């Protein structure tokens, strides 16, 4: 089977490159920057991609590449930092006068194979500080911008190619075409990878790993945890124990809905824990989003461990902790690389650190759309497979600032109206994720000829393939008007509704 190796130099979106290659039907594997040329040779890839990274190639502790890799006679594409590594090795890289972030127009000087099927002017996404100032010997410039003299370059004889921009993000419209050119026309890779028999493979791996032991798992009801739980359940049956912890920040009627869902899927060992009071008590007067995440994460561990110890007395063979962790969770927690900048903590990634159980993460190498495809193959109901993502900390990170009972009740009602109207209008399945958030400020309004001073609700709906990048959804005006009208009339404490039109990046999908 053909494969492309993506070498990660600490980029938050290195996995996005990996995902894009898989989308092309070619298997790709992500490895760390300190991999040796010998190991690369053994993997025998059709091509190599060098990712971007948050540091300068000249920083003292910046990640470097085994220079022998550049001489393996395997096609290599350097993206951003990856281009600069090639440029540093063969030419000269200088710090840019200004860091360049956002959309830019490139002028293509020579299409070559890498940029074939592109127009003379194309929009791309830049995110860099350094730039290759002088063209390395025997390289050719393929494209430039008004501020970047070498936006793309190649050395066909050495099979080295470089892009200063990011083809993997949606903000580079022809990015997939460029990757396709590299993978199929330069690397000559074969389109021979798909989910295929992955469910059976994962189920067998779980059987082999767990053996005669049992697994305990937090069941949130989301697509990730439900697909992971279903795989584990099919592998070990009644040896799986699922615990649903209500931390008080879940959506309206969520607890009842989740428990009923798992019962319909014939899960036998289900346990409900109402821990809302302890969570809300510990969140009193806490405004910092990272502190909120950590408090929720630590309290979740404490509550979960307490339940696990109770169950362990009855079921002493519980030795594994099942989790629905997927790639984006790990990326945003900067787990794959010491060089990566942390965006925010994910409590399901840090959970095992304080527990003595072995971790079982059947979905850790998959992306959300692949998880959904798995869910379909496992014949899970559509409303589970295409359920919108919901963060572990729940509404606590959709309430900006302090979490109070009043704010929670307001947000639960507003969120319920938003979801209900999206479903009624047949838009729920057309967006990747939709959410309501409460801003911790009040604005002046008028209701019934009286002055009001109440909260703002922000509505957000995005389209995406894998949550690594996202665009705001163009919901129709009439639908937004209806949702806004209902919230303003039915939810006490709100006098203003706004719609968020931010992309990711630079914004994240969630607010905190």
Give names to the regions the model predicted.
Residues 323-324:
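Extended catalytic-interface subdomain
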Residues 1-50, 54-72, 84, 88-319, ...:
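RNA-binding accessory domains that recognize and position tRNA/RNA substrates
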Residues 76-82:
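Conserved helicase ATPase motor motifs in RecA-like P-loop NTPase domains
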């Amino acid at each position: 089977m053909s494969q492309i190796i993506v070498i990660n130099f600490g980029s938050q979106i290195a996995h996005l490159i990996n995902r894009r290659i898989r989308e092309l039907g070619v298997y790709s594997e992500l490895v760390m920057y300190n991999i040796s040329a010998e190991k690369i040779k053994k993997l025998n890839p059709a091509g190599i991609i060098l990712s971007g990274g948050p540091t300068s190639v000249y920083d003292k502790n910046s990640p470097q590449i085994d220079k022998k890799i550049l001489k393996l006679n395997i096609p290599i594409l350097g993206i951003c930092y990856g281009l600069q590594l090639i440029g540093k090795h063969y030419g000269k890289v200088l710090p840019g006068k200004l860091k360049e972030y956002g959309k830019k127009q490139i002028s293509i000087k020579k299409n070559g194979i890498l940029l074939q099927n592109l127009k003379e002017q194309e929009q791309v996404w830049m995110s860099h500080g350094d730039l290759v100032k002088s063209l390395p010997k025997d390289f050719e410039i393929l494209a430039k911008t008004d501020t970047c003299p070498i936006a793309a370059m190649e050395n066909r004889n050495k099979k080295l190619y470089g892009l200063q921009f990011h083809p993997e993000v949606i903000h580079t419209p022809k990015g997939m075409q460029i990757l396709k050119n590299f993978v199929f026309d330069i690397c000559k890779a074969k389109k021979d990878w798909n989910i295929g028999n992955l469910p059976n493979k994962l189920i067998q791996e779980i059987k082999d790993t767990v053996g005669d032991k049992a697994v305990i798992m937090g069941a949130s009801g989301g697509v990730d945890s439900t697909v992971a739980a279903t795989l584990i359940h099919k592998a070990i049956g009644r040896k799986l124990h699922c615990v649903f912890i209500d931390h008080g920040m879940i959506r309206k009627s969520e607890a009842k809905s989740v428990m009923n869902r798992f019962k319909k899927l014939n899960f036998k060992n289900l346990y409900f824990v109402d821990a809302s009071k302890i969570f809300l008590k510990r969140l009193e007067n806490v405004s910092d989003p990272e502190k909120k995440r950590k408090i929720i994460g630590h309290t979740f561990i404490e509550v979960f461990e307490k339940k696990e110890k109770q169950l362990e007395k009855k079921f002493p063979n519980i030795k594994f902790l099942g989790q629905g962790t997927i790639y984006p969770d790990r990326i945003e927690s900067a787990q794959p690389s010491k060089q990566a900048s942390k965006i925010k903590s994910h409590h399901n990634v840090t959970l095992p650190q304080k527990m003595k159980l072995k971790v079982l993460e059947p979905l850790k190498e998959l992306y959300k759309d692949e998880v959904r495809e798995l869910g379909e193959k496992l014949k899970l109901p559509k409303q589970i497979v295409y359920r919108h993502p919901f963060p572990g900390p729940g509404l606590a990170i959709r309430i900006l600032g302090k979490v109070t009972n009043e704010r929670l009740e307001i947000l639960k009602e507003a969120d319920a109206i938003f979801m209900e109207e999206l479903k009624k209008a047949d838009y729920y399945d057309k967006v990747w994720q939709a959410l309501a958030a409460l801003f911790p400020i009040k604005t002046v309004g008028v209701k019934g000829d009286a002055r009001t001073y109440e909260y703002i609700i922000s509505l957000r709906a995005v389209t995406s393939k894998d949550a690594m990048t996202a665009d705001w959804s163009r919901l129709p005006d009439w639908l937004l008007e209806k949702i806004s009208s209902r919230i303003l009339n039915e939810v006490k404490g709100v006098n203003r509704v706004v719609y968020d039109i931010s992309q990711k990046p630079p914004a994240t999908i969630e607010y905190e």
